[in-house]
A protein has these predicted regions:
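Asp-box/WD-like beta-propeller blade repeats and closely related beta-sheet repeat scaffolds
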Residues: 91-114, 119-161, 171-174, 198
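Conserved loop/turn at the beginning of each blade in beta-propeller domains
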Residues: 14, 24, 76, 91, ...
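Conserved beta-strand position repeated once per blade in WD40 beta-propeller domains
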Residues: 27-30, 104-107, 155, 211, ...
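Beta-propeller domain segments
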Residues: 1-13, 48-77, 153, 171-177, ...
């Protein structure tokens, strides 16, 4: 079974308390705490897309079976929900559905009365003041993203200055086995200038960056990354690292600094002269999903 039974709770570290804040949610995946204490949550699953020809049908069949067994199969609710704990007792007594027409939403960011939501293939901006109970209109598209086949979640982080938005897009494949052409615009972090609308690749070679945040001390962007599979139970470590502008972390050709993945059949680009080593190894296959 997935989760905890009635009356059961996760074990908390000494000095901390864990309680059930909300339940009855249809596959919640990402959370955003707003400055007024409201919590936004996406209810979402992978998009149903035509993946076309090619790929590894047996791998996809097994993966689909495992996802369904874990509760990740089925249709996406496509909802953005607001949870409100008005009396501060640690339990959300208020629940409002702000949107139910999104498309496999995941990333959420808020700043300057604007709410940013990442569908699997785009980033939308909505007018939203703190304390609001509605999210009206269609939203302004501020960026297109590679559609959500493969790694479909799209994490967002707003720069502390409020003028740039960062969007993480994972790879479609494990090590580019289906061709590097389909990996265009993937395995990277986009920087979106909110004043001009221009996009640039901020960091690349990141197989599946699944958490984004800025250090309150250095101001640097940090991320947690899910690394490649099928090299055994001891490789490759997922990692936590800072992301300097223009950096490359090696995917798919190299992992963890200077280890070449001989399975990759596509030649390494000549322009890739330096691969950065991640700051902290988290262990293989731990699948860190937030930061």
């Amino acid at each position: 079974p997935v989760g905890w039974a009635d009356g059961e709770l996760p074990l908390a570290a000494e000095g901390l308390v864990v309680n059930r804040f909300a339940d009855g949610l249809d596959h919640p995946r990402t959370l955003q705490a707003l400055p007024n204490g409201d919590i936004l949550v996406t209810l979402t699953r992978a998009p149903k897309l035509d993946t076309g020809e090619g790929g590894n049908w047996l791998r996809d069949l097994v993966a689909g079976f495992l996802f369904r067994k874990a509760g990740a199969g089925g249709e996406s609710a496509n909802e953005l929900v607001l949870l409100r704990d008005a009396d501060g007792d640690g339990v959300a007594e208020g629940r409002l559905t702000l949107r139910d027409d999104l498309d496999s939403p995941s990333g959420i960011a808020w700043g300057d009365d604007t709410l940013y939501v990442a569908n699997h293939d785009e980033v939308l901006a909505f007018d939203y003041a703190l304390g609001g109970t509605e999210l009206t209109g269609q939203g302004r598209k501020i960026a297109d993203l590679a559609e959500g086949t493969g790694h479909w979640m799209r994490n967002l982080a707003l720069h502390p200055d409020g003028d740039r938005l960062y969007a993480a897009v994972g790879s479609k494949s494990n090590i580019g086995e289906d061709g590097m052409e389909i990996e265009q615009g993937r395995a990277l972090i986009w920087e979106i200038n909110l004043e001009t609308g221009r996009q640039r690749v901020f960091g690349a070679g990141l197989r599946n960056a699944n958490g984004l945040d800025f250090s309150p001390w250095s101001g640097e962007l940090w991320t947690t990354v899910n690394e490649r599979d099928m090299l055994g139970s001891d490789l490759v470590p997922d990692y936590l690292t800072n992301v300097p502008v223009g950096v490359h972390y090696g995917w798919p050709w190299i992992y963890y600094g200077d280890n070449f993945d001989r399975r990759v059949k596509y030649p390494i680009p000549q322009a890739l002269s330096y691969v950065r080593t991640p700051e902290y190894a988290l262990g293989p296959h731990v699948a860190a999903l937030g930061l």
